[in-house]
């Protein structure tokens, strides 16, 4: 029999550990919210159809059914709130006491990182919020004490009235100090 191979890397938590945050008997809050949205949409549609049919509720079944669907949607949204609140209670420690990287509150300073694609006249920029002292933080985009200070961009194109056409002056990357 061949020896068992040890895997390199972090251990994968068991399914029971992953689902520890939710009570097993309650449905998913996302499911309750989705059902509530469907019932709300149906209730609004049926209520509007009934409201324009006639204004006597006893002879207008659409108005009664539409209002019942709206009450059902309110019940689903209430269940969504209950399921999401009850799922947080049985944890061993609170979210504020969790360590860094575990979803804890007040983890420290946050840096605003901006990454841009190749310098072209039509440029796109991605903005990412990450902790200032994380592995994802490059340190290049926030060298100073004010990580949220943004610099004004250099002009991307200058129009010269010559026969050659347009002269492009793309922004240059700064040399690291």
Swiss-Prot record:
Residues 1-20 are annotated as: Disordered. This is Transmembrane protein 275. Keywords: Membrane, Transmembrane, Transmembrane helix. Disulfide bonds: none annotated. The chain crosses the membrane at residues 36-56, 62-82. GO terms for cellular component: membrane. It is found in: Membrane. It is a multi-pass membrane protein.
């Amino acid at each position: 029999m061949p020896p068992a191979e040890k895997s390199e890397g972090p251990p994968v938590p068991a399914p029971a550990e992953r689902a520890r945050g939710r009570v097993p008997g309650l449905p998913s809050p996302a499911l309750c919210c989705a059902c509530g949205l469907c019932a709300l949409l149906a209730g609004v549609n049926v209520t509007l159809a009934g409201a324009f049919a006639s204004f006597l509720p006893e002879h207008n079944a659409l108005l009664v059914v539409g209002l019942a669907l709206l009450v059902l949607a309110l019940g689903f949204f209430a269940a969504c709130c209950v399921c999401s609140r009850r799922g947080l209670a049985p944890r061993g420690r609170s979210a504020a006491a969790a360590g860094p990287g575990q979803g804890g509150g007040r983890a420290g300073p946050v840096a605003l990182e901006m990454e841009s694609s190749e310098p072209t006249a039509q440029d796109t920029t991605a903005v990412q919020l990450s902790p200032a002292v994380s592995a994802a933080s490059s340190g290049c985009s926030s060298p100073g004490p004010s990580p949220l200070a943004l610099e004004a961009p250099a002009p991307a194109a200058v129009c010269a009235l010559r026969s050659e056409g347009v002269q492009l002056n793309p922004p240059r990357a700064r040399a690291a100090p």
